[in-house]
A protein has these predicted regions:
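Beta-sheet repeat architectures centered on beta-propellers
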Residues: 3, 10, 36-57, 63-202
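Surface-exposed extracellular loop regions of Gram-negative outer-membrane beta-barrel proteins
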Residues: 15-40
């Protein structure tokens, strides 16, 4: 491998090897027929903690945003392989690739990526992105106030646990309760515009 390795993950009986500037896959059944094949030599993964199996594909953080392995392999390094174009401005200005963590919630078909700037003292201003697969497209929303040092997801005895560890030494559970770490959750709802027979009337 001619680039520093950032992550290894198994997907559909193939080992995907993510490096900083390349992506390869190791395919085969025995030592005699293992073959190292390039997925792309133009795009790599800067942070191994962003590599997740999501919605029947592998999603990772490339130099130009979130990408899927299938699109990257099919169309190379062109912009069409980037799935995060609608929220691309959220990734701009973050120069340290280590400032990310992620997790997947399969029963919600959600990929969550957090911008974990350790030097940011105001945790309430720390943001993240939720990516949801809907049909053949992706929808996005923004999180605020979560600054994880690590993340995990598990199902135990039929109960779903979405967890993250904070830099304050505590382990937090997401998707539970009706407040945010003791604070009231501010929510806004907007219904679809009602045409009322005239598109000029709202």
């Amino acid at each position: 491998i001619d680039s520093p390795i950032t992550a290894l993950t198994v997907f559909r009986e193939e080992l995907f090897i993510f490096a900083e500037e390349r992506i390869y896959k190791l395919a085969g059944n025995t030592v005699a027929d293992f073959v190292l094949q390039p997925v792309t030599r133009e795009i790599g993964c800067k942070n191994g903690f962003t590599v997740q199996e999501f919605a029947g594909d592998i999603v990772f953080l490339g130099p130009d945003g979130l990408r899927s392995v299938a699109a990257t392999e099919r169309i190379g390094d062109v912009e069409l392989g980037t799935i995060s174009l609608p929220v691309q401005e959220r990734f701009e200005g973050i120069v340290d690739p280590d400032e990310f963590d992620s997790l997947v919630i399969p029963d919600k078909t959600q990929y969550r990526i957090f911008f974990t700037n350790r030097s940011e003292r105001n945790q309430a201003q720390t943001k993240g992105i939720i990516c949801v697969r809907k049909g053949d497209s992706y929808e996005f929303s923004e999180t605020k106030g979560i600054q994880p040092s690590s993340t995990d997801y598990l199902i135990s005895s039929g109960t779903t646990y979405v967890l993250h560890g904070g830099y304050d030494g505590y382990v937090y559970r997401q998707e539970q309760g009706n407040d945010f770490d003791g604070s009231t959750i501010v929510g806004r709802y907007r219904s679809p515009d009602i045409v009322a027979g005239d598109a000029g009337i709202r």
